[in-house]
Amino acid sequence: MIRNPFHLVEYSPWPLTGSLGAMFLTVGLTSWFHNHGFITMLLGLFLVLMTMFQWWRDIIRESTFQGYHTMKVSLGMRMGMVLFITSEICFFFAFFWAYFHSSLAPNTDIGASWPPLHINPLNPFQIPLLNTAILLASGVTVTWAHHSLMGGNHAEATQSMVLTVILGGYFTLLQAEEYMEAPFSIADSVYGATFFVATGFHGLHVIIGSVFLLICLFRMLIHHFSTNHHFGFEAAAWYWHFVDVVWLILYTCIYWWGS
């Protein structure tokens, strides 16, 4: 990438390694479900993680050390992040469509009732309600970090980011415990399938968002962000707020109404 108002990138191997990694990971994971292909899956995972690390390292170099991220470049990245979150909204919309398609007009195969016969749904006022409070609190702390960063208060920004990462990890642990104690599985009719797919993909997004925030915390500690140049943090915060909103819809529709 050269220094000019527009986003002109240099030659990079990472799109190629990333696409190869995605292919190997998909093929390997599909094969792993049939008891083979574990090595292919590990190779794909390694390539994806390596590409993520190296590509983000290059972007950080361009923005923090070389000063290539002008206002026009930053605007383009903001538009890209907005489009990415829009695609994620469509992704989760498909799961909610599947859920309501099955729940609003239950098939006779599941007893013409929702939840299906012999399915004991989780109590929405136990772990799910605690997880809701945790994610809402994490949304407050990440906003606190953002305002502290814009105000030049490095200590408060760091402390609030630590709290956000801890809350994200705590949510993941509680979700894993909920899965282990659930009285039904993903194989228990369309209810189990839609429940675990929707909440499982949300849990994956929480893990991804926690990794984003952890990287931002590390960059805060080495003073990569300034009061007016911190889009990496803003993108992670947008993603985290998106995860919060999806969870509120999941809790309302699947845990509370669906039970």
UniProtKB/Swiss-Prot annotation:
UniProt cross-references to CDD domains, sorted A to Z: Cyt_c_Oxidase_III
GO molecular function, one term: cytochrome-c oxidase activity
Main localization (coarse): mitochondrion
Domain of life, per lineage: Eukaryota
The EC number(s) this enzyme carries: 7.1.1.9
GO cellular component terms given for this protein: mitochondrial inner membrane
Keyword Protease: no
Catalytic activity field: 4 Fe(II)-[cytochrome c] + O2 + 8 H(+)(in) = 4 Fe(III)-[cytochrome c] + 2 H2O + 4 H(+)(out)
InterPro entries, A to Z: Cyt_c/ubiquinol_Oxase_su3, Cyt_c_oxase_su3_dom, Cyt_c_oxidase-like_su3, Cyt_c_oxidase_su3-like_sf, Cyt_c_oxidase_su3_a-hlx
Membrane topology annotation: Multi-pass membrane protein
SUPFAM superfamilies, A to Z: Cytochrome c oxidase subunit III-like
EC category: translocase
GO biological process, one term: mitochondrial electron transport, cytochrome c to oxygen
Protein family membership: Belongs to the cytochrome c oxidase subunit 3 family.
Function description: Component of the cytochrome c oxidase, the last enzyme in the mitochondrial electron transport chain which drives oxidative phosphorylation. The respiratory chain contains 3 multisubunit complexes succinate dehydrogenase (complex II, CII), ubiquinol-cytochrome c oxidoreductase (cytochrome b-c1 complex, complex III, CIII) and cytochrome c oxidase (complex IV, CIV), that cooperate to transfer electrons derived from NADH and succinate to molecular oxygen, creating an electrochemical gradient over the inner membrane that drives transmembrane transport and the ATP synthase.
Description of how the protein assembles with itself and partners: Component of the cytochrome c oxidase (complex IV, CIV), a multisubunit enzyme composed of a catalytic core of 3 subunits and several supernumerary subunits. The complex exists as a monomer or a dimer and forms supercomplexes (SCs) in the inner mitochondrial membrane with ubiquinol-cytochrome c oxidoreductase (cytochrome b-c1 complex, complex III, CIII).
The name this protein goes by in its record: Cytochrome c oxidase subunit 3
Phylogenetic placement of the source organism: Eukaryota, Metazoa, Spiralia, Lophotrochozoa, Mollusca
